[in-house]
Amino acid sequence: MTLAPADLPASLQPLVDRALARLAQVLPEPIPANLLPLLTRLAVTSDFALDTLVRQPALLAQLAAPGCPPIPAPVLDPLQPSDWPAQIRRWRTAMSTRLIWRDLTGLDDVAQTLAGATALAEDCLRLALDALQQEFAQRHGVIADEHGIPQQLVVFGLGKLGGGELNFSSDVDLVYAYPQGGESDGPRPLAAEEYFARLGQRLAKLLDETTVDGFSHRVDLRLRPFGSAGRVALSFAAMDQYFQREGRDWERYAWLKARAVAGDIEAGEAWLQTLRPFVYRRYLDFTALDGLREMKAAITAEVARRELHDDIKRGAGGIREIEFLCQALQLIRGGREPALRERRLLVALDALVAAGQIAPEDGSALREAYLFLRRLENRLQMLRDAQTHVLPSDALDRERIAVGLGYPDWEVLRAALAVQQQRVSTEFAALLAPRKGQAAPDALANYWRSLPEGSNAPLLAEAGFLDANGADQSLRDFAQGTGVKSLSDAARARLDRVLPALLHAATRSPQPDAALKRVLGLLQAVLRRTSYLALLDEQPSALARLVDVLARSALLAERLAAYPLLLDELLDVRVSGPMPDAAGMLAECQQVLAVEDPESALRWLNETRLALSFRMAMATLDGRQGAVDSTRQLAELAQAVVVTVLAMAEADMHAAHGEIPGGRFAIIGYGSLGGLELGFGSDLDLVFLHDNPAGVDASDGARPLEPGRWYARLAQKVMALLGAVTAAGRLYDIDVRLRPDGGKGSLVSSLASYTEYQRERAWTWEHQALVRARGVAGDASLLADFEQVRAQTLGRERDTGVLYADVLKMRGRMRTELDRSDAARLDLKQGAGGVVDLEFLLQTGVLARSARHAALLQPRDTPSLIDALAVAEFLPEDTAQALHGAHATLLDVGLACTLDRRPRLAPTTPAIEEACAAITAACIAAELPFA
C-alpha cells in the first residue's frame, strides 16, 4: 500500500505537512512528485526516518535508486579513532532508514526486515571490532595460541541476534569469550583475560554510547556467565567449567539461539558444538518445562508489577510466548531429533510441524501470529527508533501506527491484534497447562506416601492385585531403596505424583501384578534421570500408554527399562502411524554417517534401530499389522543397519589402509534376514564375498595390506560394529557359520571360491539355505554376480530322488535334536507342521523345479515363494492359499510369544492345529512326510 496525500486522514495532515516542509528545506531541489506518496507514508510511519533524511539529505537519492541498494559502509581510519563513533552511527541510521524504506515499498517482507536488522547489527559489530583490534594490536600486541597463531575475541550473539531475527530497534545480547589464556606481546602487555575484557568493553561503548549522532546498538552483556557479577570475557575452558557446574535451565533457552557473530567466528562455532549437550539433553527432556514455567512466572509478575498489559512481547499472547513454546519443544526433543536444533524461529516451527510436535493448522496459526506481531513490533520501534514493545497510549501515535499498517483506525488494528494474541495464548496454555492435582489424595496415593513404614495389602487386594502381599512387599522394598531415598525434593515430588497414577493404571490393566512388577523395574531404571519422571508427570497419556504396554509385553518392558529413551516413542505421533518403507529406514540410519565421532555415530545408529523396532513392536502388539509385515520390516531395518555399518567400516579402512584398486566387497544375508522374516532379537546370518582384480597385490594407503587381509579386516570391522556394546545396546548378534566350509572356512570368500564351493562341494542343506539368501550390502556389480552364481546353483538339474532323501534325512535329524513340543504344546518353529516344515517344503520345491521354472529363482520370502510354487504347479492353488493362512497364523502366535518373552511353545489351539494340519498335508502331498 502506498498512501497518497489525498487518502491521508485529516488528523494526520498537519504532521505530514510539517515533516515534508522540514525535508524540503534541506533538499537542493523540490521533492519529486513521484516520491510524495511514499514520503507521505514515511512521515506517518517514522519520525526517525524523516529526521535521518533531514540530517543526511543526500540519502534520499540513494533510497530512491532502483532496488534501493545498500549504503556503502564507512572506512574507519585507524589514525582517527575519535571519528569512529560518528561514522558508525551515521551509517547505522542511514541503513536503518533504508530498512524502513524497503518495508514501506514492499521490497522486504517481515522476515527480510528482521534479517536485514540482524545483518546491520553484525556489520556494525564487525566494523567496530576490526578497528579496535588494530588499535589494541598496536598498543598491547596480540595474544598467540600454543601454535603461535594470534587469537581473536569471539563475540557470541544470543537471543534474536543469534536467531537472525533482530527487531528494528533492539538491543543486542552479547557474550565475549576467547580460546585460551596467555599474554599479549606488545609494548604494554596484558593477560588474556584483561586484554579481551578491555576490548569487549571498548566494543560495547563504541556501539552503545549515545552521542550527538545517537547510538549504534544498545549492548546487553548480562547474559554472560554469572551475569553482571561475572567477568566480561572468559576463556573457552572457563565457559566449559561454568556450564558444567553452574548452568541453569533459563540459560539453555538463551544459548539455544547462540551464534558466533564477530571476531573468530570459526572458533566460536566450534565451541558452540561442545555446548550442545548442555542445551539439548541426550534424552527426552520434559524438565525443560520447569525452567519455562519459572521464566513465564517471572515475566507475568513483571508485566503485572509494571502494568505492561499492552506489551506485545511479554504480555499474554505475545511474541515471547511463541518463542517459549517453540524453544521448549526444541529443548524437550532436540537431543533426539537434530532437525529441531534450529536457531531461527520460523524454521524451528516448520521442523516441529514436520516432526509431528505441532499440528499443521496450529503451526500455520502460530506463523501468522508471529509475523503479525513482529511487523507491529517493528512499526512501534520505527516510529522513534525506540526499544519499545508497548502499544502507544497517545491517540495520534495510535492512528499513525494503524494507518501505516493499512488499517482504517486503531480499533480495527486492536481487534486484529486480539485475534492473534488469543491464538497464541491458547497454544501456549496447552503446553504449560498446570498439572491437575487431585482435589484430595486418594487411598493409593496415601498408601504410597506411608511407605516404607506403612503396609496395607488389603487395600492392594481391593484395588485388584491378585498377589496383594507380594505387591505390598515390592512397593515397600522400592520405597526404601537408595534410588528413592536419594531423590531431590523436586524429583521426589514428581515421583509422589507419578507412582499413584501408575498404580491406578496398573489396576485397570489385564494383568495388574505383572504390570506393577514391570512398572517398578522401569522406575528403578529411570530414577536418576529425572527427565523421564518429568515426562510421566507432564504427559498423562504417555503414562497410561506405558502401563498398557508393560502389562502386555515383557519384551518391551525389558527394553524400556534398559533403554528409557524409548519412552519418547510413546509420545511420538509416528508410533501409531505408518512405518517408513525400506528406503525411509535406510535414510534414517544413514544420517549417522555425518557424525564424525565413531562412538557417537554407533550409539545414534543403535538408538535409531531401537526406536524403529519399537514402533514395529507397538504396531504388532496393537494389531495394526500382522507378523508377516512386521518381520519383513525388521529384516529391512536390519539391512539398512548393515548397509550403514559397512559404510562406516569402509571409511575406517580407507583412512587407515587405503582402497583395493578395482576391488569389490559384498555382504549376503542368509536365513531370516535373507528371507525377510526377521524376529525381534534375531541374529543375522551373514556371508562375506570379495573379488580382487588380477595384478593388484596391496591396498593403496599409507599402511598397505594385501587384498586377503584387507577384506578380512573389513569383515571383522563390520562384525565388531554390529556387535559393539553401546549405551543404547548392541545392534545385532552375528552368525557367519553358513559360509563355505562353515567354521573351518575363511571369513571372507572370493567370488571364484564361493562359486566353486557351491558347484562342487556344497551339501543339499546348503543349497536349501541358498534359496533364501540375497545380497544386502556392498558393491552392486558383485551383488549381481552373486545373483548369477545363485541362479546357476539353484537352477541346475537334480536327481529328485537324492534331493528328497537328503531333505527328509536333514529334517528328521533336526526334528530329533531341536523339537521341544510336548503333549500340550507345539514348538511353533521345529514341531510337526511348524514353520521349518513349511520352509523345507518350499526350498525343496525350488530345488526340484527351478531348472524348468526360472521365476522360482526370484522370490526369497515365504509368501512370494508360495505364490511362485503355485504358478510352477508344485503346489495346488487351494494348498497355496491354505499355506498362506497357516504361515500367517504361526508367525502371529510366534511373534506374540516373543513380545511377551515366552518360549515359542504354544498350547495347541484350534487355529494352530488347523495351520499345522495344512502344512503337514501339503508336505505329504509333495511326498515329504516329515512327521
UniProtKB/Swiss-Prot annotation:
Region of interest (Adenylyl transferase), ranges: 441-931
Molecular function via GO: [glutamate-ammonia-ligase] adenylyltransferase activity; [glutamine synthetase]-adenylyl-L-tyrosine phosphorylase activity; ATP binding; magnesium ion binding
Obligatory cofactor(s): Mg(2+)
Cellular component terms (Gene Ontology): cytosol
CDD domains: NT_GlnE_GlnD_like
Superkingdom, taxonomy of origin: Bacteria
Matches recorded under InterPro entries: GlnE (IPR023057), GlnE_rpt_dom (IPR005190), NT_sf (IPR043519), PII_UdlTrfase/GS_AdlTrfase (IPR013546)
The entry's keywords: ATP-binding, Magnesium, Multifunctional enzyme, Nucleotide-binding, Nucleotidyltransferase, Transferase
Keyword Magnesium included in the entry's annotation: yes
EC numbers for this chain: 2.7.7.89, 2.7.7.42
Enzyme class, UniProt record, top EC level: transferase
Annotated region (Adenylyl removase), positions in chain: 1-434
Catalytic reactions on record: [glutamine synthetase]-O(4)-(5'-adenylyl)-L-tyrosine + phosphate = [glutamine synthetase]-L-tyrosine + ADP; [glutamine synthetase]-L-tyrosine + ATP = [glutamine synthetase]-O(4)-(5'-adenylyl)-L-tyrosine + diphosphate
Pfam families, sorted: GlnD_UR_UTase, GlnE
Metal-binding found in the keyword field: no
Single Gene Ontology BP annotation: regulation of glutamine family amino acid metabolic process
Similarity-based family: Belongs to the GlnE family.
NCBIfam families, A to Z: PRK11072.1 (NF008292)
HAMAP family on file: GlnE
Its job: Involved in the regulation of glutamine synthetase GlnA, a key enzyme in the process to assimilate ammonia. When cellular nitrogen levels are high, the C-terminal adenylyl transferase (AT) inactivates GlnA by covalent transfer of an adenylyl group from ATP to specific tyrosine residue of GlnA, thus reducing its activity. Conversely, when nitrogen levels are low, the N-terminal adenylyl removase (AR) activates GlnA by removing the adenylyl group by phosphorolysis, increasing its activity.
Protein name stated in the entry: Bifunctional glutamine synthetase adenylyltransferase/adenylyl-removing enzyme
Native species: Stenotrophomonas maltophilia (strain R551-3)
Lineage: Bacteria, Pseudomonadati, Pseudomonadota, Gammaproteobacteria, Lysobacterales
